């Protein structure tokens, strides 16, 4: 699934509810999911990690939808490698 499709699915599935919840609460939910991902990385098995990565991506897509950010456009920042030094691999100090 590409990022545009993810954003579309999240919008159609949760968009109305997400807008009612609002940006501050969505950020809080995203932070909670990042915490769950961190725990799964430390202590979980592969299936738990996949689950938590999916949840984080869904909340990122929700937040992006609410604030009008196209994630496909956003990731272009990394299209040529490191956004600071433009090298692959990064050669930043």
Describe the function of each predicted region.
Residues 1-53, 57-93:
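Flexible "arm" and connector segments at domain edges
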